[in-house]
Structures are given as structure tokens and as C-alpha cells.
Amino acid sequence: AGPHHLHYTALPDWATTLGMVFSVMLWMPSWGGMINGLMTLSGAWDKLRTDPVLRMMVVSVAFYGMSTFEGPMMSIKVVNSLSHYTDWTIGHVHSGALGWVGFVSFGALYCLVPWLWNRQLYSLKLVNWHFWISTIGIVLYISAMWVSGILQGLMWRAYTSLGFLEYSFIESVEAMHPFYIIRAAGGALFLVGALIMAFNLWMTVNAGQASETEGAGALQPAE
């Protein structure tokens, strides 16, 4: 599926077309995994209201599904002709990197640290703050890049009636400036969330109460 990243380059057309076909095929196993992950919670969805760690893990699976839908869609040549080399690709990658990989890593750390140190998690309230601050940050980040990327693609392919480019490259860069501000704000919020997690885990290890139970019981808050 890798050649779909090289549409409209020196790579032979047949190779990129083959990559597109395999990329579209990846919808099935990717969404099979996502559906399997979400349906594991069947009958226990009420836990999402009280367990922010579980909520973070479930949202990571949702971001995985969104990212793995968007990737094959962007591999289709008619879509890629607009998205290629634009910020849309950056938005797509970061919906997976921050939303999927980031959140599943955070959730794993929130589970593993109390288990490894046999401590109660210092504060579920801080986990909840981490979840919402980081989620807002991710949404701001990727939404700004989606809009920025589509705008870039449309500006780059706009021609005058005489066949000249309607916008210069620097005009397209200037048009991106507001979206880059939003992107920076989103990234800063995501970082703040990660710092909250670092503090929470540090306090869990150094000031958390010893857990009387093994495994998942250690996820009960100490406060």
C-alpha cells in the first residue's frame, strides 16, 4: 500500500495504482479491528461515564477507525490530486499519531504504573482533565489541518482564464497563517494534557497509597 504516498511522482503509474488498490483493501482489516475493539465493551458502556482511563482507550480506538478510513480514502487518485503535499496529509497523520497512538499509550501508562508499583492511581479527576484537554487539543489540531489542506489544494489548482496560476505560492502560505495558530494552540493543549499525566503518575509512584488488591483494583483513585 506504500506507493499511494507517491502518486504523481516519478514512480510508475501502475505501481501507484496497485498501491491504491491495496490501500483501499486495508479498510476491511482496519475497521474489523476497530469494530472488534469497540464491541468488546458491549454491555458495559456505562463504565465510560465513571472511568476516564477506559474512555481514553475507547476514544483512541475511534481515532484509529477515523484515521484508517481517511488513509485509504486519500489514496484514491482523484482525492489525492487535491490532498497531495498539503496540510490535509498532516491532519490525517496526526489524527492517528495523537488520537490513536497517543491516547492508547496514555491509557496503557495509566494502567501499568499503578500495577507495577502496586499503588492506587493518585487522581482520576486529573485523568479526566487530561482526557478533555487533550481531546480538545487534538480536534483543534486536526480540524485546522484539514481545512488548511483543502484550502491549499484548491488554491494550488486554481487557474485564471488565461491559464496562469491564480494564486502565488506565498499567497497560499499567508492564507494558512490562521490555521497554523489554531494548530499551535491544539498542540499546546495536547502537551498540557501530557504534563498533567506526568504529574499524576509521578504522584502515584511517590505519594500514592499502597493498593490492597492486584491488577485492575489499583486503578481506584487515592483521593
Give residue ranges: language-model regions.
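Hydrophobic cores of alpha-helical transmembrane segments in multi-pass integral membrane proteins
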Residues: 1-7, 18-40, 54-77, 90-116, ...
